[in-house]
């Protein structure tokens, strides 16, 4: 009788160990997937704009403005077949990795000097597999709509649409898990991964704008230049052309962490570099 009880206890122990092992395995797999999604960085998501389509996993995504609704229609084309995915997009640029698509939806109110004014603004995640929308954040009151310019799966980057197209204001970092928005109050156009930082530029404005480095979550902003009209990353350096308001320019560079700024040319008329 005692042996049977011991055998039963051993069997129960083995079952518990196996259950714990399976639990740890599934937890580890989930964590690995999340880490991999984040480690792909900003290159995992493609930016699609109303004037430039983009290809992700064999599908071409494009946008077209609907004058009647004051919104964009988002299309997907593959193997010669084109279909409308969304007709409620208010953002002039969106991002997708082929699984999810991020955009803002809002009701247009009126036009202004620096862009349209909207109400009922919402940041939305669209699941391309289930074709369902999920509202992540609802914004209060009237205001400008954000264009989405980048995403790494954990953080999403966007800025207020203006009349300049690629030039956007009040750059924001969205924590997708916590659904929190951090506004930096700076202009923006592009985002790019540089080592463990994010390089933000505002080169979409005709007069240029700030170039700066941030942590992925938007913290510790470091200004590289207050008015850069061209920015590129090559090898161990960030190269940028900065300008004055009377259109003198010079080409400069700095280390990938924003240190050791160096002018490569003297100030001159025209665009340096």
Task: Kindly give the residue locations of the regions a language model identified.
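Bacterial N-terminal signal peptides that target proteins for export
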Residues: 3-16
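Sec-dependent signal peptide cleavage junction
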Residues: 24-40
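Residue position within the beta-strands of beta-propeller blades
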Residues: 60-64, 102-105, 156-160, 199-202, ...
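Beta-propeller fold detector
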Residues: 83-88, 134-138, 182-186, 222-226, ...
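Short loop/turn segments that connect beta-strands within beta-propeller blades
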Residues: 77-81, 127-131, 174-179, 215-219, ...
């Amino acid at each position: 009788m005692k042996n049977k009880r011991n055998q039963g206890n051993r069997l129960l122990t083995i079952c518990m160990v196996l259950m714990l092992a399976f639990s740890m395995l599934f937890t580890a797999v989930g964590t690995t997937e999340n880490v991999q999604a984040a480690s792909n960085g900003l290159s995992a998501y493609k930016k699609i704009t109303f004037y430039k389509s983009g290809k992700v996993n064999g599908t071409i995504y494009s946008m077209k403005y609907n004058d009647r609704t004051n919104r964009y229609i988002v299309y997907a084309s593959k193997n010669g077949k084109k279909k409308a995915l969304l007709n409620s997009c208010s953002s002039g640029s969106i991002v997708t990795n082929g699984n999810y698509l991020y955009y803002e939806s809002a009701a247009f109110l009126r036009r202004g000097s620096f862009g349209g004014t909207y109400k009922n603004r919402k940041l939305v995640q669209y699941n391309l597999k289930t074709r369902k929308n999920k509202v992540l954040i609802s914004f209060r009151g009237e205001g400008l709509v954000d264009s989405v310019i980048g995403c790494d799966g954990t953080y999403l980057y966007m800025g207020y649409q203006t009349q300049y197209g690629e030039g956007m204001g009040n750059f924001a970092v969205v924590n997708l898990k916590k659904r929190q928005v951090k506004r930096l109050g700076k202009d923006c156009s592009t985002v790019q991964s540089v080592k463990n930082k994010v390089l933000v530029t505002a080169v979409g404005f005709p007069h240029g704008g700030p170039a700066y480095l941030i942590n992925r979550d938007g913290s510790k902003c470091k200004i590289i230049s207050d008015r850069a009209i061209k920015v590129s990353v090559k090898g161990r350096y960030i190269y940028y052309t900065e300008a004055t308001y009377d259109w003198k320019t010079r080409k400069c560079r700095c280390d990938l962490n924003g240190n050791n700024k160096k002018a490569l040319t003297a100030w001159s008329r025209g665009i340096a570099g």
